[in-house]
Amino acid sequence: IIGADECDAAGMLLPHNYIGRISDGMPNLWAFLNSDADSEARQSGAQGGAALEYRLHVHAPLRRGSMFCQLSGIRALGNKTQNMAHVVIDETAGRCAATAEAVGVAMDLTTRKAVLISAERRQRLEQLMIR
């Protein structure tokens, strides 16, 4: 539910809070997509992630008190990049509130560099990609 502190004076959700709310849902996506080895690398602090590019399109602004749900998935894979798509549904109004696309990478937190998507991870993600 959208809180008053997330909105402007007119009661509309501020743009940065759409991205914040989508980001809050990412652990759920990774829990579904990651292999045990991926999860262990993240939990140990050896690996993290970063969004390199983000595009947000607000179609019908969420308002204070709106209930929403988020649908997310992988749209494409590069050597190191994962293109993610997000749809934010305004459950109160019954319509699409916003869509977003992001390009993300897994990062080696010791070297601070993006890592290649392993063959095992690529195979798993390709099976789960949005078609």
Question: What do these predicted ranges mean?
Answer:
Residues 58-67, 74-131:
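HotDog/MaoC-like acyl-thioester-processing domains
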